[in-house]
């Protein structure tokens, strides 16, 4: 087995591009119906799971793609990952896909506030980052306003493959 990690520094929670970046990341690998899951798991059968995520920290943030594959699929998997990134940097996301992911994120944001433990995590998050109660409303509004062209611009702005680190570990 090979573990594959691809990543780079990323937008922070308080950056203006954060909501759009969250949407972009979800399209690529942030949920089960993402492009990476559809391609690398469903179509190619290289892995049981692949995903991408953004980790926001107070001083710096990072973005990562993670998966495990059989050794013989390592290079092909990396190639497919970069094909999907290239598509997002060069082609607009279809409106139907964008709306599906927006609705997914709306539900995901609501789940972050559902229940006492989720609300306490949200409060901790707001305190750590100096956010006020309007933060979530602002995120939802920015997601709502995001267009296919904006997603294309964000992908081109933040996902230059030459700025990404690729790490693999496992048997050669």
Predicted regions and their residues:
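His/Glu-based metal-binding/catalytic segments typifying zinc-dependent metallopeptidases
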Residues: 1-35
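M16 family metallopeptidases and their MPP-like homologs
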Residues: 5-11, 41-90, 95-145, 161-170
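Short, conserved catalytic/metal-binding micro-motifs enriched in Asp/Glu and His
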Residues: 22, 151, 166
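Active-site phosphate/pyrophosphate- and oxyanion-stabilizing loops and adjacent acidic/basic residues
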Residues: 38
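Low-complexity, intrinsically disordered Gly/Pro/Thr-rich segments
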Residues: 147-156
